[in-house]
Amino acid sequence: MRHQDVAIIIPSRLSSTRLKQKPLQLIGSITLIERVFKQVNQAGLEHTYVATDSEEIASVITKVGGKVIFTDSAIPTGTDRTYEAFKLIPNNQNINYIVNVQGDMPFIEPSSILKIIEYLKNSKYDVVTPIVKVDRESVKASSNVTVAVDSAGTALYFSRSLIPNGAEEFLYHVGMYGFRKNALEKFVSLKPTFLEKTERLEQLRVLENGMTIGTCLVENVPISVDTEEDLKKAVKFYENISKLGL
């Protein structure tokens, strides 16, 4: 299999403040977390894991042949859970890159994951994350995050506000990250920063501590499920693509 030095980790915890038992919600006849895993697994990497504190989530994943790493329920963030899972991977000394894929994107495209990996390996960035060009109407929701970049595509700032102010086209941030191993180790050793806490965005801890984030353009904004309304949209999307035979 390709990219033997890369691990993909999907953090998933059962408790959710906005949508009860979110990972186990059904989209069609399949749970959200199973759909995420199956999409990610199409990238074809051996080291693909779901990191969870839940026996129920673990059961769903192992039944479809996936690998699970149990992590403590007290772990505060998805990135921290990703690192804890990485430490428990057998022979992890051979892994140099870790990709964190959020467990709430049921239709994530495997090509986006592979693009992160290739870009990370062929650049000097500490972290790489995907972005999508969108218009103003597409990023009005407060849960959306936009990013400002320099001419080389290096991230300058992430915000829940629309940046840059006054623009008609924006760069939407997709919540996936490719880390170099040493960058992930450094990240989890650092305390949450002022901007991170203000914006409620972990990636600002990277920038505030002088590390670099590269961005790679992908074509589509993936559906993220955080609320009951999001779930309804995901179910509708699934029904539509099913009718088309996709």
From Swiss-Prot:
<dbReference type="InterPro" id="IPR029044">
    <property type="entry name" value="Nucleotide-diphossugar_trans"/>
</dbReference>
<dbReference type="Pfam" id="PF02348">
    <property type="entry name" value="CTP_transf_3"/>
</dbReference>
<protein>
    <recommendedName>
        <fullName>3-deoxy-manno-octulosonate cytidylyltransferase</fullName>
        <ecNumber>2.7.7.38</ecNumber>
    </recommendedName>
</protein>
<comment type="similarity">
    <text>Belongs to the KdsB family.</text>
</comment>
<keyword id="KW-0448">Lipopolysaccharide biosynthesis</keyword>
<keyword id="KW-0808">Transferase</keyword>
<keyword id="KW-0548">Nucleotidyltransferase</keyword>
<dbReference type="GO" id="GO:0033468">
    <property type="term" value="P:CMP-keto-3-deoxy-D-manno-octulosonic acid biosynthetic process"/>
</dbReference>
<keyword id="KW-0963">Cytoplasm</keyword>
<dbReference type="InterPro" id="IPR003329">
    <property type="entry name" value="Cytidylyl_trans"/>
</dbReference>
<dbReference type="GO" id="GO:0009103">
    <property type="term" value="P:lipopolysaccharide biosynthetic process"/>
</dbReference>
<comment type="pathway">
    <text>Nucleotide-sugar biosynthesis; CMP-3-deoxy-D-manno-octulosonate biosynthesis; CMP-3-deoxy-D-manno-octulosonate from 3-deoxy-D-manno-octulosonate and CTP: step 1/1.</text>
</comment>
<comment type="function">
    <text>Activates KDO (a required 8-carbon sugar) for incorporation into bacterial lipopolysaccharide in Gram-negative bacteria.</text>
</comment>
<dbReference type="GO" id="GO:0005829">
    <property type="term" value="C:cytosol"/>
</dbReference>
<dbReference type="InterPro" id="IPR004528">
    <property type="entry name" value="KdsB"/>
</dbReference>
<dbReference type="GO" id="GO:0008690">
    <property type="term" value="F:3-deoxy-manno-octulosonate cytidylyltransferase activity"/>
</dbReference>
<comment type="pathway">
    <text>Bacterial outer membrane biogenesis; lipopolysaccharide biosynthesis.</text>
</comment>
